[in-house]
Regions:
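Noncatalytic, solvent-exposed loop/strand surfaces
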Residues: 1-160
Length: 160
């Protein structure tokens, strides 16, 4: 994972990079990562044997095996990419916190909230500075910025 922050729950990992937010199906991804590790080791072993082998039936067999393992590796890696439940563009790369089903992010003079289930943008607001600190308590979001400003945002109740 090349990114800035990660939040891990039993079922999902939420990843924040400079350009996007994403949610990963952890159990499926970890299963595929284990399979990939085994296949990579097998592929490296076959490559080593190929370097040592001379022309002949053994070399042909090794080439066929390496090709099969390579195809399996490609399938596993493609499956790993499909483990992302969602991925959305985001301009808030500096901080992240999860509160219930809401993922809050801080960025360059702004803060935003995304739904953890599907990544939909729920809310965003301007902030006075780079939002490096986020905290959630009692239905409120607290932000702290590079300018020393602390802001408090109160959750609005639907239907009120």
């Amino acid at each position: 994972f090349k990114g800035n922050h990660m939040i891990v729950t039993p079922s999902r990992s939420f990843l924040q990079s400079d350009t996007d937010l994403s949610a990963l199906d952890r159990s499926r991804y970890l299963d595929l990562a284990r399979k990939r590790r085994v296949l990579k080791k097998k592929h490296e072993q076959l490559q080593g044997e190929l370097k040592k082998s001379k022309n002949g039936s053994r070399r042909v067999q090794l080439l066929e095996e390496a090709a099969q393992v390579g195809q399996q590796l490609d399938q596993v890696q493609a499956g790993m990419q499909e483990c992302f439940a969602w991925r959305v563009a985001s301009t808030q790369p500096l901080s992240m916190v999860l509160a219930g089903q809401t993922l809050f992010t801080g960025g360059h003079n702004q803060v935003a909230a995304y739904h953890a289930k599907d990544g939909s943008l729920l809310w965003q607001s301007e902030a006075n500075g780079e939002v490096f600190g986020l905290a959630v308590a009692d239905g409120r979001l607290y932000t702290s910025t590079s300018k020393g400003v602390i802001q408090c945002f109160l959750a609005r109740r639907l239907g009120n």
